[in-house]
A protein has these predicted regions:
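Juxtamembrane intracellular "pre-TM" segments in multi-pass secondary transporters
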Residues: 17-44, 239-298, 503
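Helix-loop boundary and gating motifs at the non-cytosolic
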Residues: 31-94, 295-324, 331
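Glycine-rich segments within core transmembrane alpha-helices of 12-TM secondary carriers
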Residues: 93-97, 179-200, 206, 338, ...
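Helix-to-loop junctions at the C-terminal end of transmembrane segments
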Residues: 95-112, 206-207, 344-364, 452-456
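A membrane-interface helix-boundary motif in multi-pass transporters
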Residues: 111-116, 204-220, 452-475
Length: 510
């Protein structure tokens, strides 16, 4: 998701045009060569196969999620707050996705901007998970675990940026919006398929084989990323260069009136000496020219606050396993239900909520999240049993409902990010906004860890868990104090000025 756009059909058709003269037989051969297999409206070529593979790995890598939690709890014997810190550190590579894009764009590795990095990330991911599969014999402290989990995240985050760049390139080559949308569906479909498959088996594997075995299985998946590199069509480059083009930025003054478009040059086309430094300076200068405007940083701040409220996730995991005695297999079923519920949330949003104004959507979402999130207090207090509802049934249904609401609340964030991206810097700014959103998630985990420590919630002491969950739940309303920053976005919506958002919305892949 991130997050998490489009197609290469036109390029394929161009590649299949006759290159020379020939008779009827040649024409027949060419006619047959244009008949390709189509899946979800996307012609299956080597490059679309590479895209599908990388997105599938993004979903299936979740196989290790439950094993990771049990490894930190049962084998490293970390407290809930310590486990939350490790989880936060492992998310750091997702915070600097624009950096990975900049590196691949300006510093070709062995002559390639995409293929070589995909291979490298696949190998790094495999090594990280293989090392983790050795268990406490090698990974005997939280810092080693944090480093290895972070390397595993780096392999996915970097490859996500690489494959997204290929998707965007193919989207620009295609003038057909339907094929663009079809490739978007393929991407999301592969992530969903991988996530559902991994969540279904994750709990059972942890319970029967242990975390080390699951990590060993997970080590295989990054190799698919390395394999995908050989399916990508890319010409070898002899020199390091930057291909960031001149961009036009529309500055908006207070009151929503537009000035004349201001042309802001980015990195020059072919920098031979000091190209990386110059490209970096120009890119940062361009980005700063955009983000310093209130109609950009205001909604961006709201996005960060929306994600940054504290979470009791680690404490609830320890409560579920140590107090309620939920088995790994059952927690795997809960994860599977969440994956299905997430798809349901996407469907509900597309069917009923995508045309709701953003301010109204965020306000309703925050209020509903607070109300429905309060149901966790019933589980913590045990009151659900007095109502005749078992802990397992309550946890399963509650997780599914909250996941549906979570997806409905998350998708407007992507729409907001897309709408505030001016033309010319859509990719860079969108990636930066998603990194800021991810940073909000890390902040949430750190704040949750701090509250957990402060309230004295440990692996076997849940006396203050009720207070922890209540505090985290009601802070969900706090981002609404910044809801006014969305006024200009809604004003542009009412005026029908969605041109900036259309380009960014094609890249809704967090």
């Amino acid at each position: 998701m991130g997050n998490k756009d489009d197609d290469g059909e036109q390029q394929q058709q161009q590649q299949q045009q006759p290159r020379g003269g020939g008779g009827d037989d040649d024409d027949d051969d060419n006619e047959n060569s244009t008949k390709t297999t189509v899946f979800l409206g996307v012609p299956i070529t080597s490059e679309t196969s590479a895209i599908a593979l990388v997105y599938f790995v993004q979903g299936v890598i979740g196989l290790a999620s439950l094993a990771k939690s049990f490894f930190l709890k049962d084998e490293l014997h970390l407290s809930p707050s310590e486990a939350a810190v490790v989880t936060s550190i492992s998310s750091l590579p997702w915070l600097v996705k624009p950096l990975w894009g900049f590196i691949s764009d300006t510093v070709p590795l062995f002559g390639y901007k995409r293929k070589s990095y995909l291979c490298l990330m696949g190998v790094l991911g495999c090594l990280a998970w293989s090392t983790l599969s050795q268990g406490v014999a090698v990974v005997d402290n939280r810092w080693t675990a944090s480093f290895l989990f972070a390397v595993g995240s780096l392999s996915i985050a970097f490859s996500d940026v690489l494959i997204d760049s290929i998707v965007v390139e193919r989207a620009r080559e295609s003038e057909d919006n339907s094929t663009t949308g079809s490739l978007q569906s393929l991407c999301w479909g592969m992530v969903a398929f991988g996530g559902i498959a991994s969540s279904y088996f994750s709990g059972e594997l942890v319970e029967e084989k242990g975390s080390a075995f699951v990590f060993a299985c997970t080590a295989v998946f990054p190799l698919l990323i390395a394999g995908a590199a050989f399916l990508v069509k890319e010409e070898k480059q002899d020199e390091m260069s930057s291909s960031i083009e001149t961009t036009t930025v529309v500055n908006v003054v207070d009151g929503g009136e537009c000035k004349e478009p201001e042309t802001i040059p980015t990195a020059s086309a072919e920098e031979k000496n000091g190209g990386v430094v110059e490209a970096g300076k120009e890119t940062l200068s361009t980005l700063w020219s955009v983000v310093k405007q209130k109609q950009i940083w205001g909604p961006a701040l709201f996005m960060y606050l929306w994600q940054a409220t504290p979470s009791p996730g680690s404490a609830m995991f320890y409560f579920s396993t140590n107090e309620l005695h939920f088995s790994p297999e059952f927690l795997g079923r809960v994860s599977f239900a969440r994956s299905l519920a997430a798809l349901g949330g996407v469907g509900l949003y597309n069917a009923y909520f995508k045309y709701v104004p953003l301010k109204k959507m965020f306000t309703y979402s925050a209020v509903l999240a607070t109300a429905l999130g309060s149901t966790q207090l019933l589980l913590v207090s045990g009151y659900n049993r007095e109502l005749g509802i078992s802990d397992e049934l309550f946890a399963l249904t509650d997780s599914a409902v909250l996941t549906v609401l979570g997806e409905i609340s998350f998708l407007p964030v992507l729409v907001l990010a897309a709408k505030i991206c001016p033309k010319g810097v859509e990719a860079t700014l969108f990636a930066s906004l998603m990194s800021l959103f991810n940073f909000g998630g890390v902040t949430s985990q750190f704040l949750g860890a701090g509250l957990t420590e402060k309230l004295g919630v440990t692996a076997d002491n849940f006396d203050n868990l009720f207070e922890l969950v209540a505090i985290c739940n009601f802070t969900t309303l706090l981002p609404l104090v910044a809801i006014g920053f969305l006024n200009e976005v809604e004003q542009r919506e009412e005026e029908g000025d969605d041109s900036d958002g259309e380009e960014g919305q094609k890249m809704i892949q967090a």
